[in-house]
Amino acid sequence: MSVYDAAFLNTELSKPTSIFGLRLWVVIGILLGSLIVIALFLLSLCLTSRRKNRKPRADFASAAIATPPISKEIKEIVPAQNQSVPAEIQVDIGKIEHRVVFSDRVSSGESRGTASASETASYSGSGNCGPEVSHLGWGRWYTLRELEAATNGLCEENVIGEGGYGIVYRGILTDGTKVAVKNLLNNRGQAEKEFKVEVEVIGRVRHKNLVRLLGYCVEGAYRMLVYDFVDNGNLEQWIHGDVGDVSPLTWDIRMNIILGMAKGLAYLHEGLEPKVVHRDIKSSNILLDRQWNAKVSDFGLAKLLGSESSYVTTRVMGTFGYVAPEYACTGMLNEKSDIYSFGILIMEIITGRNPVDYSRPQGETNLVDWLKSMVGNRRSEEVVDPKIPEPPSSKALKRVLLVALRCVDPDANKRPKMGHIIHMLEAEDLLYRDERRTTRDHGSRERQETAVVAAGSESGESGSRHHQQKQR
């Protein structure tokens, strides 16, 4: 191209056009850029459509191994196996009517699980298949359809409990097993966290004084936990409910309940590694079977405490009246916080009073302060629940009150460990049985002596009459 042609081309390109007075070369550049953008957009649409065509297969395959996300705070306590499958777990949560949509993402380093191919059956989101073996290696993975059938569509008539994070329903599975189904509701993500905590804390735990978790359901926005059904209500209902003038909870039964709770908590504190701090010990979380055996339930707020840690700092949660003062003030949590709550619960069982009751006169509102005052004024016998049919001996009552007062010591370091509490309670139980046996034996001897005296008297009178008849 000659110099003249280049100059002519430059002149033509520099001429203004009718499009906002832009020069010709600018307009050409805009057109070329627009064409490139359109081409890229069409290419992206093409790639997206191809991915969507392949996505259902991938989703179906991943659904077969999807499990509830595992909390970083609660790690699975299992021995190492030869083949471990690092689980980067992400549950795809869809929108379901009347349920809040929420999700939780964890990295592969936060959770690990072990499973073999035979442990996991194919899973259908529609709920057509029955419960399958859990990927976690314990329990069952129930479908939503099965749990809805068991609870009659989660109807209100089957509601047996309700809390801030969920509703508990009574249910019967197809094999006739009675279960309690806890449907967790979302509360700023707390339901998702509570689900993971409960699954990991009590999934593998087996103790006669801890409620047994049978399995769980993860489907859409639903998070459900399936427990053994404990068919005699909870301790709160039997202490504060309308049971008449005389409570069926005798002193012996109440002491057995206290001892059962202590054994369950001792297992959590001293029988597991890392130890488990329940964090919400209260009367409504103590279930009772037909033999009045206590079973600690509701581990949604539980925390793990490793052997290398003396406490864990966390947001203060629990139930007003049961929370240890040092935990409420600092957020520093350890097993001594549970022991404080346990002491409050002992007082509640003995007195039949709530930990905090604003309907009572001034000076009796706070159970701990009132009880300390009564014991200090040598009026211990007056604190016993008037509905107890047969009050305990003074010595037995004072020993149990001593255990309760030691548990609520303001200095957490002075509170006894749960194992020590069990020894004190068992000694008290033995003492009480010995006293009752001594009383019964003493009464029996008195009755025998009376019978002997009466028999001797009758024999003497009979002999005297016989002698008089012979004289006649």
Curated annotation (Swiss-Prot):
Region (Disordered): 437-472
Residue sites binding ATP per the record: I160, G161, E162, G163, G164, Y165, G166, I167, V168, K182
Pfam families: Pkinase
Alphabetical keyword list: ATP-binding, Kinase, Membrane, Nucleotide-binding, Phosphoprotein, Serine/threonine-protein kinase, Transferase, Transmembrane, Transmembrane helix
Subcellular location per the Swiss-Prot or TrEMBL entry: Membrane
EC numbers: 2.7.11.1
UniProt family annotation: Belongs to the protein kinase superfamily. Ser/Thr protein kinase family.
PANTHER family named among the record's database cross-references: OS01G0323000 PROTEIN, OS03G0125600 PROTEIN
Membrane topology recorded in Swiss-Prot or TrEMBL: Single-pass membrane protein
Catalytic function, reaction form: L-seryl-[protein] + ATP = O-phospho-L-seryl-[protein] + ADP + H(+); L-threonyl-[protein] + ATP = O-phospho-L-threonyl-[protein] + ADP + H(+)
Record InterPro entries: Kinase-like_dom_sf (IPR011009), Prot_kinase_dom (IPR000719), Protein_kinase_ATP_BS (IPR017441), RLK_Ser/Thr-Kinase (IPR052232), Ser/Thr_kinase_AS (IPR008271)
Compositionally skewed regions (Low complexity) per UniProt: 451-462
PTM-bearing positions, type Phosphothreonine: T67, T143, T314, T319
Domain called Protein kinase: residue spans: 154-431
GO molecular function: ATP binding; protein serine kinase activity; protein serine/threonine kinase activity
Species the sequence originates in: Arabidopsis thaliana
Gene Ontology BP term (one): protein autophosphorylation
Keyword set includes Kinase: yes
Residues found modified as Phosphoserine: S284
The keyword Phosphoprotein belongs to this UniProt entry's keyword annotation: yes
Positions of modified residues (Phosphotyrosine): Y227, Y327
Comp. bias (Basic and acidic residues): 437-449
Transmembrane region(s): 24-44
Annotated catalytic residues: D280 (proton acceptor)
Name this polypeptide is given: Probable serine/threonine-protein kinase At1g01540
Listed SMART domains: S_TKc
